[in-house]
Amino acid sequence: MRLMIVFFGLLLFFFQYSFWLGKNGWQDYKNAKLEVQRLTAENIKLNARNELIAAEIDDLKNGVDALEERARLDREMVKSDEYFYRIVPRN
């Protein structure tokens, strides 16, 4: 009887050790859970960025306003009936 209690005690200790400290145990589970949360948050940010880029691409393909806005901001272009004034600071 005493041998059986010792055997089951050691068996319980072995399983508890492997659960808490062993490979694929509690620590690995917690680390994997944190990694999944981090990657999920990163995916949400990337999806939002992709939606903005897709909307901008769609606007550039179908609309004239976005193309005109890009020409004005990036290339400093003006229409034929407009005047462009550049104010240069005194440094």
Curated annotation (Swiss-Prot):
InterPro entries: Cell_div_FtsB, FtsL/DivIC
Regions annotated as coiled coil: 27-76
Membrane topology: Single-pass type II membrane protein
One of the protein's GO biological processes: FtsZ-dependent cytokinesis
Cytoplasmic side: 1-3
Chain ranges on the Periplasmic side, renumbered to this chain: 22-91
Compartments (UniProt record): Cell inner membrane
Cellular component GO terms held in the UniProt record: cell division site; cell septum; plasma membrane
Transmembrane domains' residue ranges: 4-21
Keywords of the record: Cell cycle, Cell division, Cell inner membrane, Cell membrane, Coiled coil, Membrane, Transmembrane, Transmembrane helix
Family: Belongs to the FtsB family.
NCBIfam families: PRK00888.1
Subunit and interaction comment: Part of a complex composed of FtsB, FtsL and FtsQ.
Function per UniProt: Essential cell division protein. May link together the upstream cell division proteins, which are predominantly cytoplasmic, with the downstream cell division proteins, which are predominantly periplasmic.
Protein name, per record: Cell division protein FtsB
